[in-house]
Amino acid sequence: MASYFDEHNCEPTVPEEQYRQNALLELARSLLSGMDIDLGAVDFTEWDQRLPPPASKKVVESLPKVTVTPEQADAALKCPVCLLEFEEGETVRQLPCEHLFHSACILPWLGKTNSCPLCRHELPTDSPDYEEFKQEKARRQQKEHRLECLHGAMYT
């Protein structure tokens, strides 16, 4: 006896593709049933596959310029990108995470990506799609945390 796939001359669906198809079907059903859409069924992992966009030009321009103090110079602090020691009185850029960099080192970096090269602290971008993705990701993490807390509270 021939299998279902042999009889219908087709191939079984890959699990990742099946998930996408189910999400699209759920979206279509929601649209047809009065726009009652549950965004939990929509997969927002598209940005996980791509590089993040550059940091916002406005944010980069507003990064504070800090003068290296004698204490910092004596501590032999180095720029994490070029590994040259900061000199006393030198003007460097400070990211919101408080890491210091030479302007010539950090500005090209932030022109390509939106995060600190050391700790990956993310700066805002000019991409509305990416900002929406970050908000949705934060909402999902918050929801998962609340569910874990609820689950933990049920069994303590």
Curated annotation (Swiss-Prot):
GO terms for cellular component: cytoplasm. GO terms for biological process: protein ubiquitination. A zinc finger (RING-type) spans 79-120. Its EC number is 2.3.2.27. Pathway: Protein modification; protein ubiquitination. It is an enzyme of class 2 (transferase). SUPFAM superfamilies: RING/U-box (SSF57850). Belongs to the RNF181 family. This is E3 ubiquitin-protein ligase RNF181. It comes from Xenopus laevis (African clawed frog). The lineage of its organism: Eukaryota, Metazoa, Chordata, Craniata, Vertebrata. The gene is rnf181.
